A protein has these predicted regions:
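Flavin (primarily FAD) cofactor-binding/catalytic cores of flavoenzymes
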Residues: 1-18, 22-24, 53-341
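Redox-cofactor-proximal catalytic regions of oxidoreductases
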Residues: 20-45
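A short small-residue
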Residues: 43-47, 306-308
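A short acidic, helix-capping loop that chelates divalent metal ions and anchors anionic groups
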Residues: 47-53
Length: 341
């Protein structure tokens, strides 16, 4: 968005609570890899510096974001955590309360992403206190967990990746959750670009099939397994388990009737959204801002990036973010009277 605003000649500032743009990726587990190859993991104006089919590590993509911000002179203000956002008394602008004081702006782009708060099922409260619990967002490597058997809860791409890593490190691992559809490896290797193109051009809010899919996508949770499969779990020596139903005597109780004795539980259960930090923001029945392609339908001057199905199924991918950023920036530029590009 910053690059697009600069192309339009719109003066702006970018505030971030972290030290550098790529820190959000460097804070994930050490072996994390993107599921999109390098040529589909690039932002507009700067290709990812790797062979086309290379799957970048999370830390490598973090470095790429740092270089991107430097190349395009992003006016970044790091270590500036926004605690709250509200409209001014006149409704003609916004006040952002930060650790460095208040910021005033006529227009704001909320680019915090869709779901940023770890989702941990309430079942976790019933586990024996001796069982260590960790969400995937706080996990970096197998040594973060105490010795002994591990239950990974969640069978999405993250859960399977983590289950494989832990099993290969010598842990006794069970990965529990409902079966997740997967993209066959032949598609991952040879036709993933075509699949993303369909997500980008066919499943959009401008097509009947796209509009009919919006609610299912928003409410349906995670996507299919890409670049990894349940077979990889078995090959690594991990066990598959049914969904976590509850606890029995403080131990995890699975829907298939098994009660596991574990020393730790790793929650690979995703993230939830929370827009309550934006004071009095109107939201829809799913708790999301009402918007048209990221532009608030309720508050003039407020826009968003990274919402689920913001315009297309690709909107939550690196591949799709450029088009959404261009649209939002162009709309903001028109509202300021700027036209340089």
């Amino acid at each position: 968005v910053s690059r697009e605003l600069a192309l339009h000649g719109v003066e702006h500032a970018v505030v971030d609570g972290r030290a550098a743009p790529g820190d959000v990726w460097r804070d994930r587990w050490d072996t994390l890899r993107l599921f999109t190859p390098a040529h589909l993991s690039s932002l507009p104006g700067m290709p990812f510096p790797a062979p086309r089919r290379y799957l970048p590590r999370g830390s490598e993509f973090g470095g790429y974001l740092d270089e991107y911000a430097e190349r395009f002179n992003v006016p970044l203000h790091p270590h500036t955590h926004v605690r709250g956002l509200k409209r001014t008394a006149t409704g003609a602008g916004f006040t952002a309360e930060t650790d460095e004081g208040a910021w005033l702006a006529r227009r704001v782009v909320v680019a915090t992403g869709f779901a940023t708060h770890p989702r941990i099922p309430t079942i976790g409260q019933d586990l024996d206190p001796s069982i260590a619990q960790l969400h995937s967002s706080a996990y970096h490597r197998p040594t973060d967990l105490p010795e002994g058997p591990v239950l990974v809860v969640g069978c999405g791409t993250s859960g399977v990746q983590l289950g494989v890593e832990l099993a290969r490190s010598g842990r006794d691992v069970t990965v529990a959750g409902k079966p997740t559809p997967r993209v066959p490896r032949v598609v991952s290797d040879h036709a993933f670009g075509l699949l993303l193109a369909i997500f980008h051009h066919v499943f959009t809010r401008a097509t009947p099939i796209g509009r009919g899919s919006v609610r299912d996508v928003i409410r349906g949770g995670g996507g299919p397994l890409i670049g990894i499969s349940p077979e990889d779990l078995m090959a690594a020596g991990a066990a598959r388990g049914a969904r976590l139903a509850g606890t029995r005597d403080g131990q995890p109780d699975l829907e298939d009737g098994r009660v596991l004795t574990v020393s730790s539980v790793l929650w690979a259960t995703g993230f939830r959204h929370d827009f309550t930090w934006i004071q009095d923001l109107p939201v829809d029945e799913d708790g999301l801002p009402r918007h048209t392609r990221g532009m608030s339908e309720d508050w003039a001057g407020l826009s968003f990036m990274g919402l689920p199905f913001q315009f297309a199924l690709s909107s939550m991918t690196i591949y799709g973010v450029g088009r959404d950023a261009a649209y939002v920036a162009a709309a903001l530029a028109r509202s300021t009277g700027a036209s340089a590009r």
